[in-house]
C-alpha cells in the first residue's frame, strides 16, 4: 500500500469514532453544590461528600429530611381520610358488605390496574364481601369504564356497587348509566382529572380539587392501598408487595409516600408468600431475596403488562391472589410466553416501521394494517431513541388508525395536538406521550399539523432528550464502598433517578460482544492501576468502533456483579460520546 494511502487510512480510522459513536442524549451536568453544614450532617449518617452533594442537589438539605429519606417509616404515611370522599367510600362499601350486596371491582389492563384490583379484592374479602373483579380487555372494551360491560354485570350478575381502581375519572358515560340503573359507583383513580368530573357516588383521588391531600403522585395501587387501610383500620403491610409492583410499573414519583411504600414493599417481595409471584420470579431466574426496584421494572412489570397488551388480562388476578400451586404455575408460564411473544411482535413492527421513516419529515407518522395496537407505544419509544424525533405509530383497521405517540422534549405533543381535537375520534396524553384514534383519511392532516407546529414554534424537532450527569467519577478511587454508599439512596425511580456518572481519560483495553446474537458489548477499561468492566446493552454492533476510539467519554451507572461466589464492581453504560 502506498504510504500516502496508508496514512489516509490511519487518519480515517482515528476519525471513524466521530461518525459512528454519537450520543443518544444531550448531556447535561448537574450543578456541583457543596454545602459545608449538610456535608457534616451526611457524614454523621455515614455518607461521603460525593453522596452529600447529590442529595443536596436533589433537595435533601437538612437533618430531618435526610433521616426521612434514608429511614422511610410507615408512621409517616398520610391519613387515608385526607383523601377526598374516603369517608363516603368506606361507609358505602361497609353498608354493601353488611347488606350482602354484589360488588364489582373494575380495574385496568396494566400492572398498576392488576395490583390495584388485587389489593381491593383481598381487602373486601377480609371483611366478608361478595365481590367480583373485572379487568377490561384492551381490544374489545378499551380503557376505563365501559358502559356495555357495566350494563352486563348489573343485569346478568346482580351487581349493585361498582368500585373502580386505577381508572374512572373520565368515565362519564358508563358511570351515568350505572347510576341511572340504581347502582352506585365509587371511583378510585390517580389519572389527570378532567374539568368536569363524572357524577359518581364518591371520587377518591389524590388531586381532587375539593381536598388537600399532602402527596399528589400516588399510583392507582397507592390509592387502592389507602382505601384498604381505611376499610381495615390499619396499615395493611401484607399488601405492600403488590403496591411496590404497581407503583414501580406506573413510573410515578418515588418520593414521599411512594418511597415508603416501595421500600417496604420490596422487603415484602423478598419473602413474598404469593405463590404466583414466586412462580414468576422462578421463571425469570431471580431469587426472591435479590429483588430490587429494577427487578420489578424490567422483569415482573413487563410480564404482567404483556398479558394486557396481547390478551385477556384477568388471569393476572388469579396469579396475584390465588392459592392453587398448579394454577399459579400455569398462569405464570402463560404470562412468560406472552412476554416472549410481545418481544417478537415489538421487534417485527419496529423493523417494519423503520423502513417507512421519511427522512424529509420532522415528525414520523407511521401507520399500517396488521400491527398490534397493544405494543405500539413501545415501538414508538424505541424509534424515538434511535431517530431523536417525535414518532407516532398507528395500526389501521376498518378505516381507522389507532396508536401511540412518543415525543422529544422540544416538542410538546399534547400542546401540539390538543387544539386540533376535531382530527380525532379519541385523543389524550401529556407532553411526552399521547394515544389517539382517527380516520385514515386524516393521517396526512395529522402529519401537517405537527410539521406546522414545529415550524411555527421554531422547535428543535430532532432535539435529543436530556441526560442528567450527577458527578464525574474518579476511576482510580472507585470501589465497592462507593457503590454501597450510593445504593443507600435506593429505591431509584422517577424524581430519584439512579445516579449517572461521567468518566473520561481512560484506556479501552478490549471490547467484545456478548449475549444472544452478540447483541451486547463488554468493554474493559483502565486508568492507572484501576481497571473495570463496562456493560453496554444493545451496542454489540459497535464493538470495533469502541475498541479503536480515542478520547471516549461515557455516562455510566454503578452496579455489583455477583457470579460464582465472586463480587465485582461493574459499570453499566447509559451513553457514549467522543471528546
Model-identified regions with their sequence ranges:
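Mid-to-C-terminal polyanion-binding domains and interfaces
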Residues: 21-22, 98-99, 327-331, 337-366, ...
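Active-site cavity-forming subdomains of large catalytic enzyme subunits
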Residues: 151-221, 225-230, 255
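Hydrophobic helix-and-loop "lid/oligomerization" segment in the mid-to-C-terminal part
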Residues: 21, 30-35, 40-161, 181, ...
Amino acid at each position: 500500500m502506498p504510504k500516502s494511502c496508508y496514512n489516509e487510512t490511519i487518519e480515517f480510522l482515528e476519525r471513524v469514532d466521530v461518525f459512528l459513536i454519537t450520543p443518544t442524549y444531550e448531556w447535561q451536568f448537574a450543578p456541583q453544590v457543596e454545602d459545608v453544614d449538610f456535608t457534616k450532617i451526611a457524614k454523621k449518617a455515614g455518607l461521603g461528600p460525593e453522596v452529600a452533594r447529590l442529595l443536596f442537589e436533589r433537595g435533601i438539605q437538612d437533618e430531618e429530611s435526610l433521616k426521612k429519606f434514608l429511614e422511610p417509616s410507615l408512621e409517616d404515611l398520610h391519613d387515608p381520610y385526607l383523601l377526598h370522599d374516603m369517608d363516603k367510600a368506606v361507609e358505602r362499601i361497609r353498608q354493601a358488605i353488611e347488606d350482602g350486596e354484589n360488588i364489582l371491582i373494575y380495574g385496568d389492563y396494566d400492572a398498576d390496574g392488576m395490583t390495584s384490583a388485587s389489593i381491593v379484592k383481598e381487602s373486601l374479602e377480609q371483611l366478608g364481601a361478595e365481590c367480583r373483579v373485572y379487568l377490561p380487555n384492551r381490544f374489545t372494551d378499551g380503557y376505563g369504564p365501559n358502559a356495555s360491560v357495566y350494563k352486563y354485570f348489573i343485569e346478568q350478575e346482580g351487581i349493585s356497587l361498582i368500585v373502580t381502581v386505577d381508572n374512572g375519572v373520565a368515565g362519564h358515560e358508563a358511570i351515568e348509566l350505572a347510576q341511572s340503573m340504581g347502582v352506585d359507583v365509587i371511583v378510585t383513580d390517580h389519572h389527570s382529572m378532567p374539568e368536569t368530573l363524572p357524577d359518581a357516588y364518591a371520587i377518591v383521588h389524590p388531586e381532587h380539587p375539593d381536598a388537600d391531600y399532602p402527596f399528589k403522585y400516588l399510583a392507582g395501587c397507592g390509592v387502592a392501598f389507602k382505601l384498604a387501610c381505611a376499610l381495615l383500620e390499619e396499615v395493611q403491610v401484607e399488601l405492600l408487595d403488590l403496591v411496590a409492583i404497581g407503583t414501580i410499573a406506573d413510573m410515578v414519583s418515588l418520593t414521599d409516600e411512594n418511597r415508603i411504600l416501595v421500600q417496604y414493599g420490596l422487603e415484602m417481595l423478598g419473602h413474598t408468600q404469593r405463590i404466583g409471584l414466586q412462580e414468576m420470579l422462578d421463571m425469570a431466574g431471580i431469587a426472591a431475596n435479590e429483588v430490587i426496584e429494577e427487578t420489578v421494572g424490567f422483569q415482573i412489570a413487563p410480564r404482567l403488562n404483556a398479558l394486557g397488551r396481547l390478551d385477556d388480562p384477568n388471569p393476572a388476578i388469579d396469579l396475584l391472589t390465588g392459592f392453587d400451586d398448579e394454577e399459579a404455575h400455569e398462569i405464570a408460564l402463560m404470562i412468560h410466553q406472552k412476554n416472549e411473544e410481545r418481544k417478537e411482535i415489538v421487534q417485527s413492527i419496529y423493523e417494519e416501521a423503520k423502513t417507512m421513516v421519511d427522512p424529509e419529515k420532522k415528525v414520523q407518522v407511521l401507520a399500517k394494517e396488521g400491527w398490534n395496537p397493544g405494543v405500539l407505544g413501545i415501538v414508538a419509544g424505541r424509534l424515538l431513541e434511535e431517530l431523536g424525533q417525535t414518532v407516532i405509530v398507528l395500526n389501521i383497521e376498518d378505516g381507522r388508525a389507532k396508536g401511540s405517540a412518543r415525543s422529544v422534549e422540544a416538542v410538546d405533543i399534547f400542546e401540539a395536538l390538543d387544539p386540533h381535537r376535531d382530527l380525532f375520534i379519541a385523543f389524550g396524553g401529556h407532553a411526552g406521550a399521547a394515544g389517539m384514534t382517527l380516520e385514515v383519511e386524516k393521517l396526512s392532516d395529522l402529519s401537517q399539523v405537527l410539521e406546522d407546529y414545529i415550524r411555527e414554534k421554531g422547535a428543535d424537532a430532532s432535539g435529543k432528550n436530556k441526560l442528567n450527569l450527577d458527578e464525574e467519577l474518579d476511576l482510580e478511587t472507585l470501589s465497592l464502598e462507593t457503590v454501597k454508599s450510593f445504593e443507600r439512596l435506593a429505591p431509584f425511580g422517577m424524581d430519584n433517578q439512579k445516579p449517572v456518572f461521567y468518566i473520561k481519560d481512560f484506556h479501552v483495553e478490549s471490547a467484545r460482544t456478548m449475549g444472544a446474537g452478540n447483541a451486547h458489548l463488554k468493554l474493559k477499561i483502565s486508568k492507572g492501576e484501576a481497571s473495570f468492566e463496562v456493560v453496554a446493552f444493545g451496542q454489540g454492533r459497535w464493538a470495533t468502533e469502541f475498541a479503536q476510539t480515542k478520547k471516549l467519554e461515557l455516562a455510566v451507572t454503578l452496579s455489583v456483579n455477583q457470579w460464582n461466589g465472586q463480587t465485582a464492581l461493574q459499570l453499566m453504560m447509559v451513553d457514549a460520546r467522543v471528546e
